[in-house]
């Protein structure tokens, strides 16, 4: 089972036990969070697409770590002016593990051993 969630202005395709890096969310390691802005939920080729969100669908996740991305350097140089400026920026990020996906009105479904093995083989 997979879902497409929206968080931090971006969309992510997730399945149970996936570990993803997203824009910063409040919380410390071990906190449980829920994503309610679910754009699509599906099993295999069968999918439910929301308009804009799937009603009642919830994705549960756990915060693994809080961190920062690699530094992005913003460098400006003005030729022949002996002038340059260098700035760096590191975006705050949250690493989360997807625990389970609950479809609209249904119970939470966790990944079975077969689907986990198939996902590992595909990667």
Swiss-Prot record:
The keyword Ribonucleoprotein applies. It comes from the Bacteria. The keyword Transit peptide does not apply. InterPro entries: bL21-like, bL21-like_sf, Ribosomal_bL21. Keywords: Ribonucleoprotein, Ribosomal protein, RNA-binding, rRNA-binding. GO terms for cellular component: cytoplasm; ribonucleoprotein complex; ribosome. Transmembrane segments: none annotated. GO terms for molecular function: rRNA binding; structural constituent of ribosome. Belongs to the bacterial ribosomal protein bL21 family. This protein binds to 23S rRNA in the presence of protein L20. NCBIfam families: L21 (TIGR00061). This is Large ribosomal subunit protein bL21. It comes from Rhizobium meliloti (strain 1021). The gene is rplU.
